[in-house]
Amino acid sequence: MIKTLKRIPLVFLIAIMACSNSGDNGKDKVEEQEQAQEQGEKKGQGEERDKEDGIDGLQPTFLADQDPKPDDKKWIKVEGVSDEFNDSELDLTKWSPTPEFIWNGQDRGWYGGSRSLFEADNVSVGNGFLRIEGEKFDSPKYSPKDNTDTPPQRRYGGAYVYGKTLAEPGYYIEARMRASKTAMSAAFWLKTETKPCGENLNDGENLEIDIQECVGVFTGELGDEWTKDDWAVNANWDRIFHYNTHRHNSPCNNIGDRQTKGGKANFDKKNSDEFHIYAAYWHADGSKIDFYIDGELEKSITPVIPFKGALRLIMSSNFYDWIEETSAEDMGFNRPLEDRYTQFDWVRVWQLEDL
């Protein structure tokens, strides 16, 4: 910035100094220039990362012959649920950094697994990334909804960031993301709003689309029944592309056990070692969801029922209930802060329009 001022002609500087309140105005001007430069540098960082990956950011990420767009349509970005994270703070007009969700005077938010606590303090934006810190507390904590008559059990801190604008059927939803180097999860997903079943937008159904869920460090599992199969236990949870559609039990459907259809693929490297672009094309009629990795179709899923209603878009980091607890060192919680971040480079959501 000093070099920039040196380039300004001396006569011009004298004229500025002669003006009333010139000191304050000059300071304000310099601060504005510094802020603009900082934002430009951050934007440049994101653009440079996109260039390295061969992405222009003006269209969804697809490899050759992978774009499902019909010839008479074009992709348009849905700005309300898209973000490059190039500002210095989270855009609170788009995102909530806390799971708190007050409906009819009741907090219907979900604050994490039984050993985890979602806290807004673990959410930050910097260097062109949305960052969710994973931490091990010095002592267990309560969530705002816990029964304080029993000892607290929440020992690990993460966060839950959700979009204030709901995602709709017909959207192509993608994020460039990397897991932390801890046992915390890294997840990009959609879920029915936590309203009473008769008041949500899914005809009372409690639906979920997991575009990606993994962990940064896999320490083993506790032996819950659902993890006692080859699909889960031996899935290499710290080097996985893991996607699902869930139809959960609710008072309105009484289906009993959750109904799930999904799949997985494994990477050569760990989820914490490299960024990937995780995406899903949610067909407009809700009958099918196509899951993509780095612009390539991995699998098309037909949910057990059509997913026809709008869902909440979520970025989160949780300590899964089925993960085995080992030492803080082994689980990565003694690592430097930068290693304990789950990072989202950007989130981009698209819809089709007529040409």
Swiss-Prot record:
Residues 71-355 form the GH16 domain. InterPro entries: ConA-like_dom_sf, GH16, Glycosyl_Hydrlase_16. One of its GO terms (molecular function) is hydrolase activity, hydrolyzing O-glycosyl compounds. A lipid is attached at residue 19 (N-palmitoyl cysteine). The keyword Ribonucleoprotein does not apply. Keywords: Cell outer membrane, Glycosidase, Hydrolase, Lipoprotein, Membrane, Palmitate, Signal. One of its GO terms (cellular component) is cell outer membrane. Residues 39-54 have a biased composition (Basic and acidic residues). It is a lipid-anchor. It is found in: Cell outer membrane. GO terms for biological process: carbohydrate metabolic process. Cleaves the sulfated polysaccharide porphyran at the (1->4) linkages between beta-D-galactopyranose and alpha-L-galactopyranose-6-sulfate, forming mostly the disaccharide alpha-L-galactopyranose-6-sulfate-(1->3)-beta-D-galactose. Belongs to the glycosyl hydrolase 16 family. This is Beta-porphyranase C. It comes from Zobellia galactanivorans (strain DSM 12802 / CCUG 47099 / CIP 106680 / NCIMB 13871 / Dsij).
